[in-house]
């Protein structure tokens, strides 16, 4: 019973609590709704107030903008009116100025028309007066107008021709003076930049000896060594009282140098006899060929000329042992190449061509004693043979005036050749004449058939002639020596007498095996 009562009480209490809670919750909800509505109302009121405020601000701003635009429009309108007024005033002023100018122009036209009428009247009067004067002049002079005009034109033409001739002469004189001045300047610059060596040529070479005993060994038994040496080399070997020295004398520098080299080798070797002399002379000739080639290559290098044919190099080397009036021809050729190159550079011509032609211009002198003809013709033939250009050939051919120079380089070679030859101390007449006489003496002997070699010795007082034994017998040698002596008497001028010696040698060699 009590338990049921407790259950009922609990149920009743729970129900009451539930009902109470429900109403409490509902009451709280209504209170929240009321509070939210109040807040919403406040928000709406605030928004309405803010919107009203912004609306008023927008209206104020719009009014201000309208006022600003109105002021701007009014200002621009005032400025435009002012500008229009200024332009209107300028137009009025221009119109007034144009009116004044038009009025002045009309006055000038009236004056010009009046002046033109006066000038026309004066022209007619002058024409009539001129015609009257012409008639009077024709009556007095007896010439028609056309005849007088022709005479006047002829006089004027003569006067103008004289003035033109004087003007041309003056211009030519100034041009020539300027050309001479520039030429002197170019040549002086070239000469100042060219430092040429002077070589004093000699016909002897002095060879030192280790002792006086060596002189006897050089002479040999009954002079066989010295005779063999002189016969093989074609020079004079002078052994005198000069202490510890012998002298090699010969006008041909190549022979003299070959003999010097051979004798120095013999002295160094110590074995001196005819067979050894022949061997050393042959070796010296080969060494001489090498030295000639090296000399030619050095000359081409000094002249800055490249691409020469090897045979031309050898011919250049031979020029070292050739003189022209005492001037070394190789030194002269290098000097001409250098001068021609400098002048060509100043004139903006072909410097390489000028140097090449200058180096080769006297190459014919290397063989002119072996080949007939002037050295210019020989040089042209040699250069053509070894593939030189037509410009180089022309410069060589024209350097002595045998051809008219047609290029600037050819003229420069002529000038450089003359400058080098005319330099004080460059050439001597005496030595050249002496060498020419000895060369002529040898040429006379070599012109006869059967002659193998001919050597002029003893300063031209003796000539030794080697003949071919298979072509000239003993009787033929007697006839030949007389013919050579007679031809020397007829063709050569010389002091005193010349000894002509013919040597006929038959050499038989056999080897024992």
From Swiss-Prot:
Q: What is its EC number?
A: 3.1.-.-
Q: Residue limits of the KH domain?
A: 203-266
| Cross-referenced InterPro entries | HD/PDEase_dom, HD_domain, HDIG_dom, KH_dom, KH_dom_type_1, KH_dom_type_1_sf, Ribonuclease_Y, RNase_Y_N
Give one Pfam family, short name only: RNase_Y_N
Q: Which domain of life is it from?
A: Bacteria
Subcellular localization, as worded in the UniProt entry: Cell membrane
Keywords attached to this Swiss-Prot or TrEMBL record, sorted alphabetically, are: Cell membrane, Endonuclease, Hydrolase, Membrane, Nuclease, RNA-binding, Transmembrane, Transmembrane helix
Chief subcellular location equals: membrane
Name the top EC class.
Answer: hydrolase
Q: Which SUPFAM superfamilies match?
A: Eukaryotic type KH-domain (KH-domain type I), HD-domain/PDEase-like
Q: What does this protein do?
A: Endoribonuclease that initiates mRNA decay.
Q: Which family does it belong to?
A: Belongs to the RNase Y family.
What is the protein's given name?
A: Ribonuclease Y
| Source organism (scientific name) | Desulforudis audaxviator (strain MP104C)
Upper lineage ranks? Bacteria, Bacillati, Bacillota, Clostridia, Thermoanaerobacterales
Gene that this polypeptide is encoded by = rny
